[in-house]
Amino acid sequence: MESKAQEKQEQKKGYNPQDIESRFYAICEKRGYFEIEGNKSLWQGCAPKCFSIMMPPPNVTGVLHIGHALTFTLQDIITRFKRMEGFKTLYQPGLDHAGIATQNVVLKQLLAQGITKESLGREAFIAKVWEWKEQSGGEILNQMRHLGITPAWSRLRFTMDKGLQKAVKKAFVQWYNQGLIVQDNYMVNWCVNDGALSDIEVEYEQNHGKLYYLRYPIKDSAQSLIVATTRPETFFGDTGVMVNPNDERYKHLIGKSVILPLLGREIPIIADSHVDMSFGSGCVKVTPAHDMNDYEVGKRHNLPFITIFDEKGIFNKNAGIFQGQERLESRPLIVQKLQENGFVEKIEDYTNQVGKCYRCGNIVEPYISKQWFVKKETAHNAIQRVNNGELHFYPAQWLNNYNAWMRELKDWCISRQLWWGHRIPVWYCECGNKVASESDNPICPQCQSTITKQDEDVLDTWFSSGLWAFSTLGWGNEDTNTQPPLYHANDLAEFYPNSLLITGFDILFFWVARMILSGESLLDSLPFKDVYLHALVRDENGQKMSKSKGNIIDPMEIISSYGADTLRFTLAILCAQGRDVKLSTQSLEISKNFTNKLYNATNFLNMYLEQLGGKEALKKGFGDINHIHINTPLGQYMLVRFYTATNEVRAALENYRFNDGASILYRFLWGEFCDWGIELAKASKDSIYELGAIFKAALILLHPYMPFITDALWHTLNASDIQTSDSIMIHSYPKAMEKNEQHSQLERTFEVIQDVITSIRRLKAMLELGSTNIECIFVKLNAPFEHSLLEQFVCKLAKVKTLCITQQKPKDCVGDVSKYCECYIQLGEIDLQAIGTRLHNQRQKLEKEITKLQAMLGNENFIKNAPKAVMEQNQSALHNAQEKLDKINAELIALGLQS
């Protein structure tokens, strides 16, 4: 156990986050502060209000990235705030089994040993995945701890744990029995690596390709129909060509037939309003088995559906001589063969949008496959109830995006061709019956035999995570709880709906909308009261981070260099609702300097405490603002400013304006308390006891944002030790205070004092007097003021021997005019001529610099050829030079030296 003396010695060396963060975190976690009843001391014997927030479960394969860091930081800020407010708080942690990603990780390890999953078999392979999960999965959990977040770790859930497996089965069977889950042959998005994909798992990219004009000979004619396509390799599956019924060029051909190139198969010419007459030749091929739009056309016109390649993209017998070849690799060979036989009219450059797999980047193929789907009808009530105000989005504009997507919702393909994941709970009896069951090996209701054959596919990962808001609270988990329990019987009643969800806007449709429709459909209740969607974290230039750009920011490196508090505060202060976060070294340095400012303020207060009361005073530390009397004018003023900040921070947190809360704290602690409160205390040493108590309270106010340094400094000022006393994370959060006229008058008093001091310092700087003690300063005030209070602070801080209050401007003086006063210094021995010469020389240099920059920025060639960064640099230089020139001109006017 470390002694107080050792801790004090650490303080003298300077604040080092690495000395504090891991130690304080381990103590708080061990004491159970993060758990639901961790703040029971604040409940005061009453039934507390409940607050719940769900961690978006990161992939078990993942590591902490900067987007995670933002999500978890915001979640932890609001969780700490609610916990300190006395709420019974659940911050639910968890991990996602990440079907495709996890299976691929284990597959690579096995392949490196020369082992395939097929040689192992399904059960043995899944056992290997579980083995990997226990040994290597979940690295991100320890990284979260380094960030300082406080979820109830004892309740950590995994989307493949036994309880959640039961919840998944219950949801599937319930929807299946309601006819909301069906299996059928559908046109799906197909990745040759990852199998079926839902619509939102397809990412569209601009593709610079070709448009091929192919000749399809018209039956019993010497002429050909010119058909335009971007995918010539799919013509083997054509079962028709179509034209617009209003296209005069082709009306006479409707109902006739063409002969398919190379294969010689006869296919009809049909009319369909789907055809865009301006695209290509106005005539397009119809490939119902390999195109989303053609699939619908094929059904409308009863065309055959011919599949030409398998699940891996390999051509089958329907592709003739190209059987056994990969479809994309064969494209140039197919085009060459068509050209050799005179079937290519022309080829043009063409730009279009091509769908790619969101995970592996492969081109996605429309493919007819027997899959399981959740019907879109599950979403009907969810749309209406959100719009009735049962759930609120922050920022509010996300409601429009939610509505637009939900109203265009299609059936959701939920089956995946994997081994790792929630196996679809459908069983096939030898009698031909099909049963959806929550239990394994169910009894067939038709023939009464035990069914042993289960569906081979697993569910989309988003299916299980879509139940996260309530499955983690015990829904569907019956008889699968553990010791210690992962949930309690009353959890759903207390914590559902969840109070708040915080996540990135990029998974609004992947996850948030699906949780909403799942909660509404399965529990008849929306899963959240509020949903806060934050934007992206970008680099300092506003660029999206990517490995290819080399601009990835690793949060663990930031924590190692700056500490978790600096990263948390930086992310929070930059996170305005609806705006991307531009993270830079400069912004991190500002937050780091803030931590140093707090550390130095603590040292100053303790130094003065020791000077005033000796070692005994240091041993007692500073009191709490609720237990001492604040009597000095400075103490009373800083207390009013503290409560003003408290009111504003509380309002910001209640409305999820995290950046506003951080800005208010920064402004108060640095700009008001450190820059003015501590400075003014040099002229009011009796106020030190009061300022120390106020600063302790301010550290509690800041604590949700910067938990480690606030806890450490609070204990230093309190003369206590985290080893033997409670953390401030279970201290009551400062309460709001109603402002009155007396408070406003006190604020105005110190605004005047600060204004006079600032004015005198500005005047001394203009006259190059530096820190020289001035014999006399004349001050003309705009309104009556208590002179003794003014003299007490001004003479000490502005270094003035005599303060003379005047009603008019004295003779032979130079002055400074500000909001509340005019301050004057008699010229006496001041060499105005030397000052004037210096200012005029500076002005000439600046004027030359401005002329040069203006000429450069007005030069058309420079504007045309200069990189953007160079342009911005020169524009900034011009702005700064103009500001300096304006200041010099103002000083010359004030000194009466303008010429």
Curated annotation (Swiss-Prot):
GO MF annotation list: aminoacyl-tRNA deacylase activity; ATP binding; valine-tRNA ligase activity
InterPro entries: aa-tRNA-synth_I_CS, aa-tRNA-synth_Ia, Anticodon_Ia_Val, M/V/L/I-tRNA-synth_anticd-bd, Rossmann-like_a/b/a_fold, tRNA-bd_arm, tRNAsynth_Ia_anticodon-bd, Val-tRNA_synth_C_sf
CDD domains hit by this protein: Anticodon_Ia_Val, ValRS_core
GO terms (BP aspect): valyl-tRNA aminoacylation
Stretches of the chain forming a coiled coil according to its record: 836-898
Cellular localization per UniProt: Cytoplasm
Lineage top rank: taxon: Bacteria
Residues binding ATP: K547
The EC number(s) this enzyme carries: 6.1.1.9
Enzyme class (EC, first level): ligase
GO cellular component terms listed in the entry, alphabetical order: cytosol
Residue positions of motif 'KMSKS' region: 544-548
Catalytic activity reported: tRNA(Val) + L-valine + ATP = L-valyl-tRNA(Val) + AMP + diphosphate
Record Gene3D superfamilies: HUPs, Isoleucyl-tRNA Synthetase, Domain 1, Valyl-tRNA synthetase, C-terminal domain, Valyl/Leucyl/Isoleucyl-tRNA synthetase, editing domain
Keyword terms: Aminoacyl-tRNA synthetase, ATP-binding, Coiled coil, Cytoplasm, Ligase, Nucleotide-binding, Protein biosynthesis
PANTHER family: VALINE--TRNA LIGASE, CHLOROPLASTIC_MITOCHONDRIAL 2 (PTHR11946:SF93), VALYL-TRNA SYNTHETASES (PTHR11946)
UniProt record similarity statement: Belongs to the class-I aminoacyl-tRNA synthetase family. ValS type 1 subfamily.
Role description: Catalyzes the attachment of valine to tRNA(Val). As ValRS can inadvertently accommodate and process structurally similar amino acids such as threonine, to avoid such errors, it has a 'posttransfer' editing activity that hydrolyzes mischarged Thr-tRNA(Val) in a tRNA-dependent manner.
Subunit structure: Monomer.
Domain notes: ValRS has two distinct active sites: one for aminoacylation and one for editing. The misactivated threonine is translocated from the active site to the editing site.
The protein, known as: Valine--tRNA ligase
Gene source species: Helicobacter hepaticus (strain ATCC 51449 / 3B1)
Gene: valS
